[in-house]
Regions:
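ABC transporter nucleotide-binding domain
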Residues: 172-258
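Residues at or immediately preceding the N-termini of alpha-helices
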Residues: 68, 105, 215, 235, ...
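ABC transporter nucleotide-binding domains
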Residues: 2-6, 11-205, 211
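Short, charged, intrinsically disordered terminal tails
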Residues: 299-303
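Hydrophobic aliphatic residues
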Residues: 62, 174, 222, 295-296
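Short, charged/small-residue-rich alpha-helical element at the C-terminal edge
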Residues: 224-298
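Generic structural signal for individual residues within well-ordered alpha-helical segments
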Residues: 94, 109, 116, 168, ...
Length: 303
């Protein structure tokens, strides 16, 4: 079932077109990523989904209907701008957020205890928010979006500013939320996290959809074959080899992008035929970062 449907949505602020004719669908039990550089329209898109901003054009349906008050309690939202009631204790803060979303006091207290333990902050339950580190505060705000078991979770740059340990915790929790059937949509410019999580993604550039698909579809569209090698010899020879499209040097190693139909044995033979002594040779899958850089440069892959 489609939980979020955006069709041809656009939004301008004066002469600036922040979002242009953007369409996507998010199904239950999936994680959907909206990827783009800062200023590409990610936050504006999310605010339109939540009815904080009204689209100039297009249609947004949540659970198959336009946004209404009843839907608010079905959605969990982490905004890009972080903020907690700094003088409130963590327990009181989470219970308050839960009750705002329709939980009873007892339900909210039970959920608060569960989530605080889940993210490793049980000993901080009775501390004021201002006593927590920035990373701790961010985890509390994250779980405040989940405390009422929403069926739709929308997270705007959830990993921004987190250390690696806290990032792993959030990644794990997002997978857990997906497994219980929620639809999760998040925006990010941190590609390694998106690559681990998403079932489907949309790249946006200057407010426009430039690429949409599953991870497999996106990687298949950019079908160049990548090799990582270390050679004893002149690296400048690499760019002259058959089917080589691009060479990047990383110290004594090189990442070589070749045409999509290049077989590893074929490329290795070409290296040896050129008189190069190969010390390391491996085929690597194009990363989402590689694809992202191409998309942001305006390359669209195969048609």
């Amino acid at each position: 079932m489609e939980k979020i449907e955006a069709t041809g949505i656009s939004k301008s602020f004066g002469e600036v077109r922040a979002v242009r004719d953007l369409s996507f669908r998010v199904e239950e039990g999936t994680i959907y990523g909206i990827l783009g550089v800062n200023g590409s329209g990610k936050t504006t898109t999310i605010r339109m989904l939540l009815n904080i901003l009204t689209p100039d054009q297009g249609e947004i349906l949540i659970n198959g209907r336009p946004f209404d008050e009843e839907l608010k309690n079905r959605i969990g939202y982490l905004p890009e701008e972080r903020g907690l009631y700094r003088k409130m204790k963590v327990r009181d803060l989470l219970c308050y957020m839960g009750e705002l979303k329709g939980l009873t006091s007892a339900q909210a207290n039970k959920k608060a205890s569960y989530w605080v333990e889940r993210v490793g902050l049980s000993e901080w339950m009775d501390k004021k928010a201002e006593e927590l580190s920035k990373g701790m505060q961010q985890k509390i705000q994250f779980v405040s979006a989940l405390i009422h078991d929403p069926e739709i979770v929308i997270l705007d740059e959830p990993f921004s500013g987190l250390d690696p340990i806290n990032t792993v915790t959030l990644l794990e929790v997002m997978e857990e939320v997906k497994k219980r059937g929620a639809a999760v949509l998040f925006s990010t410019h941190i590609l390694e996290h998106a690559e681990k999580l998403v079932d489907k993604l949309t790249f946006i550039r200057q407010g426009q959809n430039v690429l949409t698909g599953t991870m497999g579809e996106v990687k298949g569209r950019f079908a160049a074959t990548l090799f990582r090698i270390r050679i004893d010899g002149e690296g400048s020879l690499l760019s002259s080899l058959p089917k080589v499209l691009k060479v990047q040097a990383f110290g004594h190693e090189y990442e070589v992008e070749t045409e999509g139909d290049t077989e590893p044995t074929e490329f290795l033979k070409n290296l040896l035929a050129a008189g190069l002594r190969v010390e390391k040779f491996e085929k690597v899958e194009p990363s989402l970062t590689n694809i992202y850089m191409k998309v942001m440069r305006g390359e669209d892959g195969k048609n």
